[in-house]
Amino acid sequence: MIQLEHANVKYGQALALEEISVQVDFHEMVAIVGRNGAGKTTLLKALVGLMPLAAGRRVLGDQDISDLSVESIAKLGVALVPDTRRIFPNLSVHENLKIGSIAHRPGHWTVDRVLEIFPRLQERLGFGGDQLSGGEQQMLSIGRALLGNPRMLLLDEPTEGLAPVIVDQL
């Protein structure tokens, strides 16, 4: 499980999250909903270490990871697919997926498995990332994250730009 305990997160001097405590267990699906600007993205960034904690603790399993870098937290198997698509526009879909598999942790996610759940990417393997629609870029971002075989995958606006049939597959 990953959790924040009595966490404060600041943007400069402004308090963005105050005394927030949240726990998400492995293999649990949780949706965080709220109005724009409520702190949903900030919460996800705090969980993965992209936002430092001004107070409180960040815990993974039974390990305090409050002082670990985002890279160290990623190596422990926590991945975030941000709301802004992170792909390499000058690389092909296949090359983008191969980069995702470099940080490969043992598990069942392979390029072939990703292409099974996102068949549209199979059709676009030779296309550059900048030639993809927004929904295809989102599929590629999620696929790259899955290839790291994370223990925990956090998704920010995961269905943005995806067709309803793809959302159902996810």
Language-model segment annotations:
Residues 128-132, 136:
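Conserved ABC ATPase signature
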Residues 52, 64-85, 111, 123-127:
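ABC ATPase NBD coupling module
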Residues 91, 132, 145-146:
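ABC ATPase signature
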Residues 48:
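Helix-to-loop junction immediately C-terminal to a conserved catalytic motif
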Residues 33-35:
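The feature captures the beta-strand-to-loop junction immediately N-terminal to the Walker
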Residues 147-151:
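A short, proline-enriched helix->beta-strand linker immediately N-terminal to the Walker B motif
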Residues 153-157:
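Catalytic Walker B motif of ABC-type/P-loop ATPase nucleotide-binding domains
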